[in-house]
Amino acid sequence: MAADRAQNLQDTFLNHVRKTKTPLTIFLVNGVKLQGIVTWFDNFCLLLRRDGHSQLVYKHAISTIMPGAPIQLFESGEDSPA
């Protein structure tokens, strides 16, 4: 079924910022601010790299992810799922 193969928004977003090496600001649920680029991710965590150091960040600890530059995930002609 096509819905089974479709990527979810989270994976689409993270894969895009990983491939384009877009700098991110990530806020954790405890208020801590992290910055860097995503080098890897899976269902539970992501690897954030900055100044040659990597941090493993668990997704359940993330509150907000803000890209450092505008991104376009979908073609402008596509309908939004909402």
Curated annotation (Swiss-Prot):
Keywords: RNA-binding, Stress response. It comes from the Bacteria. InterPro entries: Hfq (IPR005001), LSM_dom_sf (IPR010920), Sm (IPR047575). Belongs to the Hfq family. Pfam families: Hfq (PF17209). GO terms for cellular component: cytosol. The keyword Phosphoprotein does not apply. Homohexamer. This is RNA-binding protein Hfq. The keyword RNA-binding applies. GO terms for biological process: regulation of DNA-templated transcription; regulation of RNA stability; regulation of translation, ncRNA-mediated. Gene3D superfamilies: 2.30.30.100. Residues 11-71 form the Sm domain.
